[in-house]
Amino acid sequence: MGFRLPGIRKASFSANQASSKAVDVEKGYLAVYVGEKMRRFVIPVSYLNKPSFQDLLSQAEEEFGYHHPNGGLTIPCSEDVFQHITSFLN
Protein backbone atom coordinates (compact mmCIF):
# COMPACT_ATOMS: atom_id res chain seq x y z
CA MET A 1 0.00 0.00 0.00
CA GLY A 2 1.58 3.23 -1.05
CA PHE A 3 1.16 6.42 -2.92
CA ARG A 4 3.42 8.85 -4.70
CA LEU A 5 3.12 12.58 -4.51
CA PRO A 6 5.55 14.72 -6.48
CA GLY A 7 7.93 16.44 -4.10
CA ILE A 8 6.98 14.35 -1.07
CA ARG A 9 8.74 11.17 -0.19
CA LYS A 10 7.17 8.80 2.27
CA ALA A 11 9.98 7.54 4.43
CA SER A 12 10.79 3.89 4.20
CA PHE A 13 12.68 2.11 6.92
CA SER A 14 14.97 -0.87 6.61
CA ALA A 15 15.75 -3.03 9.64
CA ASN A 16 19.02 -1.17 10.18
CA GLN A 17 17.41 2.26 9.87
CA ALA A 18 14.57 1.42 12.23
CA SER A 19 17.03 0.53 14.98
CA SER A 20 18.91 3.83 14.76
CA LYS A 21 17.54 7.10 16.08
CA ALA A 22 18.51 9.22 13.10
CA VAL A 23 17.48 8.18 9.63
CA ASP A 24 19.34 9.77 6.74
CA VAL A 25 17.48 12.38 4.74
CA GLU A 26 18.74 13.53 1.34
CA LYS A 27 20.31 16.96 1.12
CA GLY A 28 17.62 19.54 0.40
CA TYR A 29 14.88 17.59 2.21
CA LEU A 30 13.41 17.59 5.71
CA ALA A 31 11.63 14.84 7.65
CA VAL A 32 8.32 15.74 9.28
CA TYR A 33 5.85 13.68 11.32
CA VAL A 34 2.16 14.04 10.56
CA GLY A 35 -1.16 12.76 11.90
CA GLU A 36 -2.21 10.63 14.85
CA LYS A 37 0.07 7.79 13.78
CA MET A 38 2.99 10.20 13.30
CA ARG A 39 3.65 9.06 9.74
CA ARG A 40 7.02 10.30 8.54
CA PHE A 41 7.19 12.32 5.32
CA VAL A 42 10.30 13.70 3.68
CA ILE A 43 9.62 17.05 2.04
CA PRO A 44 11.74 19.57 0.11
CA VAL A 45 13.14 22.36 2.30
CA SER A 46 11.75 24.81 -0.28
CA TYR A 47 8.32 24.21 1.31
CA LEU A 48 9.52 26.17 4.36
CA ASN A 49 9.21 29.41 2.36
CA LYS A 50 5.62 28.80 1.25
CA PRO A 51 2.91 30.73 3.16
CA SER A 52 0.56 27.74 3.41
CA PHE A 53 3.34 25.58 4.88
CA GLN A 54 4.34 28.40 7.22
CA ASP A 55 0.78 28.28 8.58
CA LEU A 56 1.38 24.61 9.46
CA LEU A 57 4.67 25.57 11.13
CA SER A 58 2.86 28.21 13.20
CA GLN A 59 0.34 25.58 14.34
CA ALA A 60 3.21 23.27 15.26
CA GLU A 61 4.86 26.03 17.29
CA GLU A 62 1.60 26.78 19.12
CA GLU A 63 0.97 23.13 19.96
CA PHE A 64 4.48 21.85 20.66
CA GLY A 65 6.65 24.94 21.10
CA TYR A 66 10.13 23.85 20.16
CA HIS A 67 9.84 20.42 21.79
CA HIS A 68 8.68 17.82 19.30
CA PRO A 69 7.86 14.36 20.72
CA ASN A 70 9.52 12.34 17.94
CA GLY A 71 12.70 14.38 17.92
CA GLY A 72 11.75 15.72 14.49
CA LEU A 73 9.34 18.36 13.31
CA THR A 74 5.77 17.33 14.14
CA ILE A 75 2.94 18.86 12.12
CA PRO A 76 -0.39 18.88 14.06
CA CYS A 77 -2.84 18.01 11.30
CA SER A 78 -4.24 14.90 9.67
CA GLU A 79 -2.33 13.16 6.90
CA ASP A 80 -5.13 14.04 4.46
CA VAL A 81 -4.90 17.76 5.24
CA PHE A 82 -1.09 17.66 5.00
CA GLN A 83 -1.19 15.90 1.64
CA HIS A 84 -3.84 18.31 0.37
CA ILE A 85 -1.79 21.38 1.35
CA THR A 86 1.49 20.02 0.02
CA SER A 87 -0.10 18.93 -3.26
CA PHE A 88 -0.46 22.63 -4.12
CA LEU A 89 3.19 23.37 -3.33
CA ASN A 90 4.65 21.30 -6.15
Swiss-Prot record:
Record keywords: Auxin signaling pathway
Keyword Kinase: no
GO biological process, one term: auxin-activated signaling pathway
Keyword tRNA processing: no
Induction context: By auxin.
Alphabetical list of Pfam families matching this protein: Auxin_inducible (PF02519)
Family of this protein: Belongs to the ARG7 family.
Descriptive protein name: Auxin-induced protein 6B
Native organism: Glycine max
Lineage of the organism: Eukaryota, Viridiplantae, Streptophyta, Embryophyta, Tracheophyta
